Amino acid sequence: MTTTLSVLDQTPVIHGHSTADAIAATLDLARLADDLGYTRYWCAEHHGLRGVSNPCPEVLLARIGSLTERIRIGSGGVMLPYYSSFKVAEQFLMLEALFPNRVDLGVGRAPGGDMRTAQAVAAGDYNRGDIFPQQVGELVGLFDGTLPEDHLAHGVLLQPEIATRPELWMLGSSDFGGLLAAQLGIRFAFAHFINAQYGHRVAEAYRERFVSRNGSKPYLAAAVFVICADTETQAAALERAVDLRRVQMAYGLNMPIPSIAQGANQAFGERELSVIAREKNRSIIGTPERVTEQLHELQQRFDADELIVLTVAGSYPARLRSYELLAQAFELNKQNP
């Protein structure tokens, strides 16, 4: 079974490094992913979080597009409730004009930060996703020219005027996103790294209820947290740092990503071990043999067309190596030479 692999990058800030380091590491990874044969490179949007550092993926994507040649680029995703659908459409049409047939627009409804930050980003008018379905419908209508006549943007010139369109994706971790994507006839990326329990049911419902739009067919990607290492010992050290991150998040601590050294030096009590055990099913960590086996099982369980790999490791070189090992294991360069 051929497996299509892509990259989701949250631009992590590792302890002891700066935001500038994190952005440079994203550019390094994008170039590597392009060379290795990954299908697409997505950047996530977050606000006010010390561990991740990309509040404006559309800006960073312009740079990534200029540094790469083949790989698709996109948002994973734009947090649409903050913005005008029309403006987001313009931004991604501009990216599509710069990089034809290479752009994905993935949208989500989460705030990408805490509620105080959300209100600051939205100038005090954050709507908590109440109008999100309407906004996604507007994007569909803007891109295919089917906005109703009574819509504010009907007949308004949408620029740049180009023949191609970004590929529109719905991002989600529940049946809400899956069913909305099915209703609108667009692609769906399920965040297994957020919700590992019911994803296969969401995937099944998405396919069953899909309504084709202009000949569209259901297409499902599962976004999975993965760390791949050369040895079990290295994998265990990297997982220790991930465990510390899990505890930090459970306690609501706004901190950089733990380094490998921090993970090695951290002692966990009974409560922390309980948190770690509860969260382990949301990640796949190990050697190439173990990781590929588990990814194949997950792909079959979801009947996924594609796997999108999120790797947040305790060092930037370890992150690069993880993607290298995966690409080798799945022979990506034979798929995308």
What does each model-found stretch correspond to?
Residues 174-197, 202-203:
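A conserved active-site cap/scaffold subdomain adjacent to cofactor or substrate pockets
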